[in-house]
Structure formats: C-alpha cells, structure tokens
C-alpha cells in the first residue's frame, strides 16, 4: 500500500492542482454525491407533488440536465463519472454492505437486460407516445420504481450486481466510456511488491485496478474513486482518446449490441423522424407511407404511427446492414462471424456519442439551457428573472456544428482500421473487409449527406420543428 505518492506522471489527473481535488478528494466527491442524490430525490418528489405540465423542474432535471447534457458531455471527456455520483450506486454501496450478499443467479447476470430496458422502456415509448416522458408524474413513477427495484437488488446480491447487469444505462455507460481520453490504472513499480491489494479490497464492485493496464480494460469501474483513497498508487491518466479501442481486449457482446441499438434508436431514428421528418417530402418516405397505410386498418389513438414506423425501420435497417456487412467481412478475413462481428463492432462507438454532440450543443444553446435554468427557478421557487435562450436556430455559427457527425464517421473508420490489425489476412482482404464491416458507419454517413441534400433540394416542411412555449407559470 502506498500512503502518499509525491511524484506522479504528467498525464495523471490526480497530480493536477484543480482536477486532482475534483477526482481524488473524498470529501469533495461525497459532497457531489449528496448533492446529486438530493436533486434526484427532490425531482422525484416534485413529480408526484406537482404532476402538471407547469412543473418543468422534474422534466428538465432528468431529461435535460442529467440526460443528455451531463452524461454525454462527461462520457466523451472523463468517462463514466456519472456512475460514480449516481444516487443508486451511492446508496447501493451501503445497502450492499448490510445486505444478504448473495451471488446473483446466472439468468440475471445478463447485460442485455439493462440494454433492453433502456431500448424498449425509454426509446420505444419515446417515439410511440410523444410527450409521455415529458409528463412529470410519468418521470417520477419511472425513477421511483427503478430506485425501489435497484435497492432490492443491492440488498439481495453482492458486488453491485445491479449496476453491472440490470441498470438501464450501466452497459451503455461502460461501453461508451471507451471513447473517453481517460483511463484508471496503477503505477506498476509501486504495485509489484504489493501483497495487501487495498485498491481491490476497497472496490465495491470487486474489481482489481492493478490489472486494468494488462487487460486494456477498466471492466465495470464506475470511477467512484474508492480505490484511490485506499492506495495512492492508483492513477487516473489522460490517454489518447479511444485508446482501448485501438488495441486488443476481451470483447463483450452486450457492448457491441449497445452501440448498434443505441445508434439505431437515437442517431438513425432521429435522422428519419426528426431529420427527414422536417423536410417538405416527409410523406414520401417509407415509414410515413407505412404509417398512413396502417392507420387505415388500425386505430393508433394517442400513439404516433409515424414515430413507431420510423423507429422500426431504423432499427431493422441498422441490424440488417450490420449483419450482412459483418458476414461478408468475415468471409474476406477467413474468420468466424462471431469474432468478426464482436471485434470490429466497436468501430460503431463514436456514431452516437460523438456524432450526437452536434445536436446536443445545438439543443442546449437554442432551448435546453433556458429550459433547465427556468426549470430550476420553478423547482426552487426562486424570485429571479427567467433566462432566455443562448442562441437562435437562425444563428449562422450553428452550421459549423454539422462537421461533428463527419468527425464521428472518420473516428469510426479509424477505429475499424486499427481493429482490423487484430486479424491475420492480406491487405487486399482487409480492404474489402473494411468496406463491408463499416456498413453501419457508412449508413450513418449516407443519412447525414442525404438529409442535407433533401433540405437543400426540397426545403423544410412548413411549421417544422417548432419548439414549445417558454412561458412558465409559478
């Protein structure tokens, strides 16, 4: 055990004046955890106490501030630090400590559970029932139910198994954190004679930080930083972005499927429904025509037929394109389909989390900033002026954000090139494998280009993408 390490590498965040305090000082971390928990509980309470649309605090706390602003921004910068301050994980460590500490049954040790909860429980409902999650009461019930369920799991099972397997965003956070330019590890020279393993003992997830470098993986680390308070030989290093994805590591099937399904549910579906759906020829697209046809025979009521079919087509097309592309790529590489699929599928990581930054920045400056701040003003009854948007949709500088999705495409291609190095095949075979294995990246690129072409050629649909009123009543 190292009690105090005086000299740290230049890229070690723990050795940096301000960031070192933010990420290593346990008092500071605990304050942030308590504040996050307090906001979470108050947001749920407000959803029950004031379930009407006037309560903008609950809506924009969960669906503006936590998701997607804080989570996406931190995932691409420092990694899954939201998990380190998550109210469920924060309280879960203490519940587990006094719980039954049973092994989670194998049928529950399935990371696809969390992915499907997110995919169907959030995104499918988001498109099928527009505005459902905007209702404060629905949001309150969702997070109250998840909290009760999580606490039961923490009490029953050891090693924070709920976070690993059943949390709706657990696998998503673990997968996309590989994009970030940070990596938790240890100083090898300090660890070589260690026999007490305080960093591993302190970890509530039963992980061994001293093995992360060798495995080229932080596994299920949530950056709670408990290990760094137990031993000063732990480092939180700034590394090359996507460093892990450029090298060999043990793949996990659920991670690749998280990339595929989230890209399909967010990037592709929004490209169909919110992108092309705002063009003058929206009625000519297959999901629109299918919706019109289905409505002749089915009463959708309050459901959005267009949203349902845009989501369905985007998901099916994405999966089919990936399967066909990877199958052909496996033939060129003379490798099994499984190895090809799950080794090269990590190239899809940047599409949503990097490409989505363009929409995130645009949305934040043109309405989410005001929504979030005014929501907090309402929630805490502050007697101050409501704020206005930081920018207008007509501001010329917003056009420069359109380059970000193309950077995500280049990033995905670069990851794929490096992961193809893990296969033994001739250069010409790898070239053809690259063309087909990158099918989802190319599909994403094509959607960006085509959407721009349609807007330029046919223009926007009248009254498209109008934003809700900013009037907020106390």
Residue ranges and their predicted role:
Residues 1-211, 229, 247-474:
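Non-ligating segments of multi-cofactor redox enzymes
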Residues 169, 221-224:
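Hydrophobic core positions of alpha-helical segments in small-molecule transporters
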Residues 210-214, 238:
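Inter-helical turn/loop segments and adjacent helix faces that build the functional surface
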Residues 213-221:
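Short linker/helix segments within small regulatory modules
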Residues 226-248:
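Juxtamembrane amphipathic/hinge helix adjacent to a transmembrane helix
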